[in-house]
Amino acid sequence: MKHLTPKETWALIQDQPDALFVDVRMEIESLYVGRPPGVLMIAWYEYPDLTPDPAGFVAAVDREAHGDKSRTVVLLCRSGKRTLDAGVSLEAAGFTNVVNVLHGFEGDLDDNFHRSTVNGWRHDGLPWEQM
């Protein structure tokens, strides 16, 4: 798995428009907090049980990739943690070009327990939208 900063990820997506850009957060998270435009929503887990479904996740990504396991799959979550597990599952299923977005959409907590102030997609000033 490759690990890229948000800015490196944005450059990759611009250079590879056929890459699958997947947000693994729950839909409600992205609605409240925001998300990059054009990102695919494929949750790693869902409310209320919050239990990951690796097989379901891999199957959903595989459908979007039309079975092309060499297609670049870029994974984004809140802070870059869920994407690690999701990426491992994709690699175990044979995907060969998996990218984890370091620090995720909101980034790490600062000293006051706030996000988007230290690092992450929003912090870096990259395009995002809120529904």
Where are these regions (language model features)?
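Rhodanese-like catalytic fold shared by cysteine-dependent sulfurtransferases
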Residues: 1-20, 27-72, 83-131
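Short, surface-exposed ligand- or partner-binding patches at beta-edge/loop junctions that are enriched
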Residues: 76
